[in-house]
Amino acid sequence: MPELPEVEVCRLGISPHVIAQEVSEVIIRNKRLRWPIPDEVCSAVGLPVLKVERRAKYLLLRFSTGTLLLHLGMSGTIRVIEQDTPVAKHDHFDLVFKHGKSLRLNDPRRFGAVLWLANDEDELGLLAKLGPEPLSDDFAEGYLFSKAKNRKVPIKTFLMNNHVVVGVGNIYANEALFQAGILPTAKAKDIDEHRMNSLTAIIKKVLSAAIAQGGTTLKDFTQADGRPGYFAQSLMVYGRAGEACVTCKTKLQEIRQSNRSSVFCPSCQQD
């Protein structure tokens, strides 16, 4: 599943190709995504993109009369292509521009989304309850510790709660907890403030490194120009169950938490 770094890489990749460019056509091949694609997305026709933003794992293309929201779901990719590029299986949506290029959404599992937000109320209804961005100043020392008080849930589950902080998905939660030396099963409320502050800094470092390396390509994700991301080569625990720990050579273990894979080193990580 594309996580925050992959969506940010996508934002950085598409922005130079679409900002200030006028939409000439909207092509919908399959409306049946996570939510049906509304006809209102055609409101973008004739308008230039003012800017491209990201909130959590949502891409937001800003226009003068509204916002086109895109979500990659479990398996989606968005690519910048020439308009005459042949249509492939699972190519559900094109945003066509006058300058000859298109944004194309490919989504085999159809858990992605394409929506039109006509006003601030629409946006608030979808995004208002999200936690802070992990790379923002709002995600600072003391924040995680204050949020974790009396929370008996495992720390990994806590980190992946979008109401606590957005965008720390399974891959990067595994990696951050390993680097912080914290077991994914440790209760959030039992982690002291010093370790929580260290974890905060490590989350920022891991996510920033992933963005710099173009994200993590495991199966579905590619960058906006079709190239893979290279952070997979830097993964220390995710996807390495049964292999030797990069630090102490202990065999990495794997468990299931909330139907997700958690990989950890029983020697380097503590409650």
UniProtKB/Swiss-Prot annotation:
Cofactors, names only: Zn(2+)
Residues at which DNA binds: H90, R109, R151
GO biological process: base-excision repair
Entry keyword annotation includes DNA damage: yes
Membrane-spanning residues: none
Alphabetized GO MF terms: 8-oxo-7,8-dihydroguanine DNA N-glycosylase activity; class I DNA-(apurinic or apyrimidinic site) endonuclease activity; damaged DNA binding; zinc ion binding
Location of the active site: P2 (schiff-base intermediate with dna), E3 (proton donor), K57 (proton donor), R260 (proton donor)
Stored Pfam families: Fapy_DNA_glyco, H2TH, zf-FPG_IleRS
Family: Belongs to the FPG family.
Name of the protein in its database record: Formamidopyrimidine-DNA glycosylase
Gene name per UniProt: mutM
